[in-house]
Amino acid sequence: MSKFLVFGHRNPDTDAIASSYGWAHLEREVFGRDAEAVVLGTPNEETAFALDYFGVTAPRVVESAKAEGVSQVILTDHNEFQQSIADIKEVEVAAVIDHHRVANFETANPLYMRLEPVGSASSIVYRAFKENGVIPPKEVAGLLLSGLISDTLLLKSPTTHVTDPQVAAELAEIAGVNLEEYGLALLKAGTNLASKSAEELIDIDAKTFGLNGNDVRVAQVNTVDIAEVLERQAEIEAAMTAASVANGYSDFVLMITDIVNSNSEILALGSNMDKVEAAFNFKLENNHAFLAGAVSRKKQVVPQLTDAFNA
């Protein structure tokens, strides 16, 4: 039996790592297949907090599937090829477990594809456990809960699905944690930005989207003080520009999200700033503007950018 690698997107966030870890466990223990969860980048501080809290060793970082001797992979928390492993087009995608839009994706063979408009890929993985009559181990439940908390900002994001609060409650019970207390501690762990270089900061949680022939980089950082992040605007802009030149991004959009007040400041650079302004009906001043109530890249930024770039 061939081995499957299971992984989330590049620049992995907590949900990317948690969902792949949980699905790999399901593959091994329920479906009887050889599967290993790996990651496409070093876990961020929020994810490191969750891994440490539940006593889980961080999965291996890999850069190539073929170099690992596998021919089949399973994707969680993403489907767009430019967000995946470098040689994604050279291996077979056996399954996708995701909660995002489908774009820039095609396969030569049929596959198992499970897409649901829920708050996290971890929510889908937990649902699969329940459907198979299996209670996930405490550490798996803890990671899946962490993925859901992270992606929905403790169920406050507009991406939160009506079923997510119940999922969170059940996972918290299995994991043996208080949902609110653990959730706040997890999110707080992800707001420590002072120790990061500008290059690290813009790469904590970043994805590239193909928008009408443009490669648009959309990154997000969580904070409790937007002004503190903007004090570093010059060096952050320099890092954004350098990344755009090195990788061919037409535009770089950074969401600086206040997780306490549920707002974001948008810092943007590139050749299509008119489209960025049209997307959010605001005017950039000194390359940034306030976006009230925006906390979700998936629901409140990417669809609006997509419409504006296609207009």
UniProtKB/Swiss-Prot annotation:
It catalyses: diphosphate + H2O = 2 phosphate + H(+). Mn(2+) 2 binds at D15, D77, H99, D151. Binds 2 manganese ions per subunit. It is found in: Cytoplasm. Its cofactor is Mn(2+). Transmembrane segments: none annotated. Pfam families: DHH (PF01368), DHHA2 (PF02833). InterPro entries: DDH_dom, DHH_sf, DHHA2, DHHA2_dom_sf, Mn-dep_inorganic_PyrPase, Oligoribo/pAp-PDE_c-di-AMP_PDE. Coiled coil: none annotated. Its EC number is 3.6.1.1. One of its GO terms (molecular function) is manganese ion binding. Mn(2+) 1 binds at H9, D13, D77. Its main location: cytoplasm. One of its GO terms (cellular component) is cytoplasm. Keywords: Cytoplasm, Hydrolase, Manganese, Metal-binding. Gene3D superfamilies: DHHA2 domain, inorganic pyrophosphatase (n-terminal core). SMART domains: DHHA2 (SM01131). It comes from the Bacteria. NCBIfam families: PRK05427.1. Belongs to the PPase class C family. This is Probable manganese-dependent inorganic pyrophosphatase. It comes from Streptococcus suis (strain 98HAH33). The gene is ppaC.
